[in-house]
């Protein structure tokens, strides 16, 4: 099998990529330079296009780089009819000045902002008001802050400053997750690991005239979902988010798994749900919605991790064009401070009778986002959207992140690249540490587009490492004994010129494959624990 290697400088290669551009609609769903974790997705009216709606993603912003989150909320949205085309709506909120316009902090940066929530309320005059619920994590006197706007994309202005202290807000002092029911009544949910009032979920009715205090006479319901420190299967950790589905109330939350659950160590890397006939409970545990570890059963019957070994994730459910998705975030790199927004499709079944069950399937970690038919093989894809990456030794999170095989690393660019958000110079995410015995995979490609075609080639942009190695290309699964089909192979040698190279791999056998299938690379080398290459991009060509 003859493999062609095309040499070139990084500048020339980027110029070539610019002719095609990195594909949209992959998972992560936003440009690969952007880091919006803790996403709360909502379908709201598009204020600039009457009669149209958009999906808005309200989340934190991982700009600190060496700590969770940042000092602004930056909003992204997509048209409901095409949820693959995300647009940066800019910074919608900062907590910088007090009620009198004076700086809140000596540094001038303002409050560090963690996971927010948002709601829309129809006011007495029939106009819609949008509320943002920031989490000023380091400013206890501003916990429970509420900001208001006439548009879903802001800007949002604080509406609950204290009448006596310009640096405080009027609230009952917790970080809030909120929900407005069809009848206009509003509810609030709170609970975080110790230090923020409660480590299980409490709930109460909210006063809609303030959106920051409890309704007079409201009863606080404690332990509506129990914590991981209590008995039971709920095992709530943090991040409550309420949704209503066919008359049932579904509470999504970050769950701390038990030791040995799923055959793995205890971690807080899953989203789960509980459901009820009432917004105030009682709630019944439903199951797992997503597990960042991408767990699967190996040929030996043991559970193995095929993605990150742990790390937090937050998110919620959203119906988009009649299909339900769980929005969550994944981890990149060797810390938890560059988290990327992801989606996974789920199936929802509701028994709408009193006490009826809500069944929601667990989503698979994949690379396709809203492209449910699979990625277009003829488009250019960043290698870092890989959803499957394993090494010869299982990855670990403690005492620090360590991978014996590939993993995606974050790419940062200064400022916002909103004007050319998907440009090849910024929309980049590479896969590093491709060692002997490791596997990288992308689920899924739409190989119906390549079926029956002759002369197919796979173009792989990479940087050679300092050891010789072989990369085998598989579809379906990464090994023959698992049902995989090997369709190509190429060598990477240490005497290749440095810098970016494009390897052209004949893959004639792919013509016999049809439908939505996974693509895998397996790596082998006589030298252990050394990277054969760093993967940048891949695409197919006739």
Per-segment meaning from a language model:
Residues 1-12:
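Bacterial N-terminal signal peptides that target proteins for export
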Residues 24-542:
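Carbohydrate-active catalytic/glycan-binding domains of CAZyme proteins
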Residues 10-21:
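Bacterial N-terminal signal peptides
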